[in-house]
């Protein structure tokens, strides 16, 4: 198995072409030295034990984002496995299986605006209506950063100091100032972009500067990604769309990276299992 230019992320197996053997999905996680640009994932067809690149599904998986988790599941109830992807700084993607050819139906299901730093994904019929629901894990609601559709987190990225490497600036609208402001201090920004020390001679000069003012004269407009949700979320399958329901408050106290769905207590209902906690090495994401 080859042809992957990114670091390898999630793996998933299913007989998606209906020939009786298990085929392989290889998720693209991160492009080395190019985070957070979207990676490309791949499907490999199982041909009598030899895996060959599925060229028919190349386009639908090109630059689908930084895939952190994946699961095959019959989301549309037509009898074949569809592909569900959790992406970082992106949506939970659903790729519908149409006789071995996949179609990205994320937008038509109303999921394209539900962007997060999604870590894990699993499926199961959580409300007993016969339809496969999705559970996606995120960073929870107990950390230093919060996000909402009206006040999203934004990640600006580009070669701002023109040294051939990507620079990153995390930003959010300051509720008091009503302006889009960086979420890192001047010292951290100046370490990554030394030219700022020439532009801002004092902390006072920098303190009230918006993202537009800081990055406005760095050349080409920066690329930007947005996160509108950080909650661990149940996506209820309503047939033609999904309804987002946050998991209970106790589940939101820490990030979660793996999620499993099964009847753990034997009562006939599907339950949700989360693995949680995060030990950070870089501020502001302390241990939680």
Residue ranges of predicted features:
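Acidic, glycine/proline-rich Ca2+-coordinating loop motifs
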Residues: 1-288
């Amino acid at each position: 198995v080859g042809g992957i230019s990114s670091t390898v992320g999630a793996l998933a197996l299913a007989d998606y072409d209906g020939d009786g053997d298990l085929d392989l999905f290889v998720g693209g996680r991160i492009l080395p030295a190019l985070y957070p640009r979207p990676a490309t994932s791949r499907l490999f067809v199982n041909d009598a034990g030899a895996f060959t690149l599925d060229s028919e599904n190349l386009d639908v998986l090109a630059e689908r984002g930084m895939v952190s988790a994946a699961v095959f599941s019959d989301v549309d109830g037509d009898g074949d496995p569809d592909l569900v992807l959790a992406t970082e700084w992106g949506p939970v993607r659903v790729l519908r299986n149409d006789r071995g050819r996949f179609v990205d139906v994320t937008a038509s299901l109303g999921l394209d605006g539900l962007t997060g730093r999604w870590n894990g994904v699993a499926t199961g019929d959580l409300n007993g209506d016969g339809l496969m629901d999705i559970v996606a894990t995120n960073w929870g609601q107990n950390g230093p950063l919060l996000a909402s559709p009206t006040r999203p987190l934004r990640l600006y990225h580009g070669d701002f100091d023109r040294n051939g490497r990507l620079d990153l600036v995390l930003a959010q609208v300051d509720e008091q100032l009503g302006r889009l402001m960086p979420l890192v201090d001047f010292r951290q920004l100046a370490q990554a972009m030394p030219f700022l020390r020439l532009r801002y001679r004092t902390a006072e000069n920098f303190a009230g500067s918006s993202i537009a003012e800081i990055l406005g004269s760095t050349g080409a407009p920066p690329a930007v990604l947005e996160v509108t949700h950080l909650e661990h979320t149940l996506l209820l399958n309503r047939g033609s769309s999904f309804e987002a329901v946050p998991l209970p408050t106790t589940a939101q106290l820490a990030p979660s990276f793996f999620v499993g769905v099964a009847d753990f207590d034997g009562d006939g209902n599907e339950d949700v299992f989360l693995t949680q906690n995060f030990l950070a090495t870089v501020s502001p994401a302390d241990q939680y």
